[in-house]
UniProtKB/Swiss-Prot annotation:
Gene behind this protein: rnfD
Main location: membrane
Cofactor requirements of the protein: FMN
Subunit comment: The complex is composed of six subunits: RnfA, RnfB, RnfC, RnfD, RnfE and RnfG.
Top-level taxonomic group: Bacteria
Membrane topology: Multi-pass membrane protein
EC category: translocase
Pfam families: NQR2_RnfD_RnfE
Designated name of the protein: Ion-translocating oxidoreductase complex subunit D
InterPro entries xrefs: NqrB/RnfD, RnfD_bac
Species this chain originates from: Pectobacterium atrosepticum (strain SCRI 1043 / ATCC BAA-672)
UniProtKB keywords: Cell inner membrane, Cell membrane, Electron transport, Flavoprotein, FMN, Membrane, Phosphoprotein, Translocase, Transmembrane, Transmembrane helix, Transport
Length: 351
């Protein structure tokens, strides 16, 4: 009788890379739709521009490296990076910033390390942080949510201002940022931090128009709920595991709740941290990147909790309004150490 020797893996499932990436992209849709409803068509344009740039940049790089271009592009990893980057950027960020961030994410943060599976840092967050450090003013220039906007923008208006810097009627981004009260608009996290440092109390800050309907800011709670729905969908499908999102959110909520209980006149309420900024996007779509996150169950819990702690620290004491991107990248640095000390012991051997 002939014995056939086979190599691993001995079991297979349908979780191919191409399909996983596609499901993650589809899970972003609820949050993206909420963004479009409250902040206009800008993020859709950014996603489209980033996607085209990512595919071109990855195709050129693969060609120079003598890799199979069509086969590699078909894994949808470049497309997912572009989508995550596009929905993270301000809706009306200039086109050249989107192109710059995407090229940096694909070529420097991904392909320079060897491509998918080799990069130690999340490419989308690398691209985002490059822009945040280089162009902080543009990266914190968000439109007021739809109920507070003085000028309604069509798809064509958004497209024109992204590529020219002004609407067809001549309105600049600075003019569009003013809400119905004539006050320059920022994100809820940025507004809360800036107002708190200027001496205002949390009670006074929450009287501002953007907090009229929600402690997390008009529109932002629905954007986060949209990404939460998408994240729960990924959990039910088994595309991601629960360890990182749960430990991330619990860590963030614990820090926010404890500080608020101790000094409610100096710290933001927990709901502002939970349902504002990029909290749910970071918890379910960015921190769970299988390439750059920890690979053990205990390690994932530590990794997620570390990100939650860093997000709270940066939001509370840092110079930037939101800390998800920096927190994820800093946690990426610790992954080898976390995996080393949390790897399961092989039977019959010491760790």
């Amino acid at each position: 009788m002939a014995f056939r020797i086979a190599s691993s893996p001995f079991t297979h499932n349908q979780q191919r890379t191409q399909r996983i990436m596609l499901w993650v992209i589809l899970a972003c849709l609820p949050g993206m739709l909420a963004q479009v409803y409250f902040f206009g068509y800008g993020n859709l344009i950014q996603v489209g521009l980033a996607s085209a740039t990512a595919l071109i940049a990855e195709g050129v790089t693969l060609s120079l490296r003598k890799f199979a271009v069509r086969t590699t592009l078909a894994d949808n990893s470049a497309l997912l990076t572009a989508v995550l980057l596009g929905i993270s950027l301000p809706p009306l960020a200039p086109w050249w910033m989107v192109v710059m961030a995407t090229v940096f994410a694909i070529i420097i943060a991904k392909q320079l390390y060897g491509g998918l599976g080799q990069n130690p840092f999340n490419p989308a967050m690398i691209g985002y942080v490059v822009l945040l450090i280089s162009f902080p003013v543009q990266m914190t220039s968000w439109l007021p949510p739809e109920p507070l906007q003085t000028i309604s923008l069509s798809f064509h208006d958004s497209l024109v201002i992204i590529f020219t810097g002004h609407t067809p009627d001549g309105h600049t981004m600075q003019q569009l940022m003013h809400n119905v009260d004539g006050v320059s608009q920022a994100t809820p996290l940025d507004t809360f931090k800036t107002s708190l440092r200027s001496g205002q109390t949390p009670q006074n800050i929450l009287q501002q128009p953007m907090f009229a309907q929600s402690l997390s800011g008009i529109g932002w709670q629905w954007v986060n709920i949209g990404f939460l729905i998408g994240g729960l969908f990924l959990l039910m499908r088994g595309t991601i595991r629960w360890h990182i999102p749960v430990s991330f959110l619990l860590s963030l909520m614990f820090c926010a709740l404890l500080s608020w209980i101790i000094a409610p006149d100096k710290f933001a309420q927990p709901m502002l941290h939970l349902l504002s900024g990029a909290t749910m996007l970071g918890a379910f779509f960015i921190a769970t990147d299988p390439v750059t996150a920890s690979t053990t169950n205990r390690g994932r819990l530590i990794f997620g909790a570390l990100i939650g702690l860093l997000v709270w620290l940066i939001r509370t004491y840092g110079g930037y309004p939101d800390g998800v991107a920096f927190a994820v990248l800093l946690a990426n640095i610790t992954v080898p150490l976390i995996d080393y000390y949390t790897k399961p012991r092989a039977y019959g051997h010491h760790r």
